[in-house]
């Protein structure tokens, strides 16, 4: 199995930020990254300590969202330069990974 180096990135948002569609469009249309997945959390909190969670009594949803994507390190570096201009500091995490590319 052949492997290639990639960079994985996670972007942490909340539904209340209303930035999910903008982020997905940016990653898909503008940057054409290799793979993107969005996850909705059932609970979470950030630096503020304010809990974001779903309950049966809540009508408004402000749940945590995680958008994960990967691509070649050079491309991710370019994407992060643009992304860091409109995503709150401390809400983007990245790390090196390996992706299988066949035999």
Question: Model-found features: residue ranges?
Answer:
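Positively charged, small/polar-rich N-terminal and surface patches that mediate targeting and assembly
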Residues: 1-103
């Amino acid at each position: 199995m052949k492997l290639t180096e990639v960079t994985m990135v996670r972007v942490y948002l909340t539904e209340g930020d209303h930035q999910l569609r903008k982020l997905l469009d940016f990653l898909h249309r503008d940057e054409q990254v290799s793979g993107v997945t969005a996850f909705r959390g059932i609970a979470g909190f950030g630096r503020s300590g304010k809990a974001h969670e779903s309950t049966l009594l809540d009508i408004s949803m402000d749940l945590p969202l995680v958008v994960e994507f990967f691509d070649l390190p050079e491309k991710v570096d370019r994407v992060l330069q643009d992304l860091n201009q409109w995503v709150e500091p401390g809400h983007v995490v990245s790390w090196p990974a390996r992706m299988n590319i066949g035999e």
